[in-house]
A protein has these predicted regions:
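Positively charged n-region of N-terminal signal peptides that target proteins for export
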Residues: 1-5
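Glycine-rich beta-strand-turn "strand-cap" elements at beta-sheet edges
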Residues: 7-8, 13-14, 18-30, 35-38, ...
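Phosphate-binding glycine-rich loops and adjacent basic patches that engage nucleotide phosphates
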Residues: 12-17, 50-56
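Intrinsically disordered, low-complexity segments enriched in polar/charged residues with Gly/Pro
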Residues: 24, 43-44, 54-57, 67-68
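Short, surface-exposed ligand-recognition loops at beta-strand->loop->(often short) alpha-helix junctions
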Residues: 36-49
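Short alpha-helical
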Residues: 41, 74, 87
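An amphipathic, aromatic/His-enriched active-site/gating alpha helix that lines ligand/cofactor pockets
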Residues: 51-65, 82-118
Length: 121
């Protein structure tokens, strides 16, 4: 029984000890963006533009960890990006407008519906 308690305690301590390393690896900042596509733009039409923005710009930025996107009904769109830091997320936004893929991406979005929030772990 004492061996079991020792092993259990060791496992718990190891789990807590690696949590900060896992958080850094997975990104400490979660960026959530929502928007609506312009009238007449389908999810099938927009999806390749969304993938191009990720591939050609976002994924190449310092501090990028991961990105996923999904569409809802009526042109709703959701993008979740994980960054290592707020500084990395802000730096990416500062260069986004200049990215070649961004122009086509933004041309299909209704600007007044765009919302971005950042959360920290």
């Amino acid at each position: 029984m004492n061996l079991f308690k020792f092993l259990l305690n060791s496992a718990l301590w190891a789990t807590f000890a690696i949590q900060p390393a896992l958080a850094a690896q997975n990104g400490n900042v979660v960026e959530v963006v929502t928007f609506k596509l312009k009238a007449g733009v389908s999810a099938a039409e927009f999806a390749p533009l969304d993938q191009a923005v990720e591939r050609e710009h976002v994924a190449k930025q310092p501090g990028f960890v991961s990105r996923e996107s999904a569409h809802g009904v009526d042109g709703d769109w959701l993008v979740i990006v994980h960054w290592r830091s707020v500084k990395d997320a802000e730096a990416s936004m500062a260069t986004f407008e200049k990215a070649t893929a961004a122009a086509q991406f933004m041309s299909k979005i209704e600007p007044s519906t765009m919302s971005m929030k950042r959360y920290q772990k």
